[in-house]
From Swiss-Prot:
Protein's gene: Prtl99C
Record-given protein name: Protamine-like protein 99C
Region ranges (Disordered): 93-143
Organism: Drosophila melanogaster (Fruit fly)
Key word Nucleotidyltransferase present: no
Polar residues bias (residue ranges): 94-104
Biased composition (Basic residues): 125-143
Amino acid sequence: MGRKRGRKEYCPPIYKRQKVARVTNNGYLNFMTEYKKRFYGLSPQDMVHYAAKQWTQLSMAEKEAFKSKKPSTITLKSPAQYVACEMKSDVAGGQQSSCQRQSPSARLRESERRSSRSKTLCRSAKNRQRGKPKPQQSKRRLSHMGSAVAYIHFLRKFQRKNTELRTIDLLKTATRLWCRLPERHRHAFERPLWIVTIGKS
């Protein structure tokens, strides 16, 4: 009987020749061509595996650049970098590494936690504001220039006494006189017009 052949350890083949690929309208094929140029010597299985991983992580603008045949300025990661990145574990925070993407369900849970925290903070802030006593305010606070009602009463009174003035001149003159009136005189125009008595200025 012949001797049994032992199993040989598998070694990835090294390709010494590289064909020149054409640039196509397919962005993924152009990306694969660029990946093959950068990491020449990979087996077809490894090239497809790691190139497909990085393609899924590219943004739409980066994918569009490969489709429009623009010169690539994207930093591609070698298979060794991917393996090292996947082996890293964030012990401190228990978060995923920067090379791995969160699943849609994980992103949804994280956004729900953030929204619930923000709602809790808003409710606590509102409760604190409700607990503070509000300063007592008068029902009708008047500024030192008087209220709008008082100014309108004064403007009507002034218009009746100066019918010859144009609208622009009437407003300018009335405003100037209103600002010069003492506060007690301005306060008198809070009452109806037939009660106010004003002399010609």
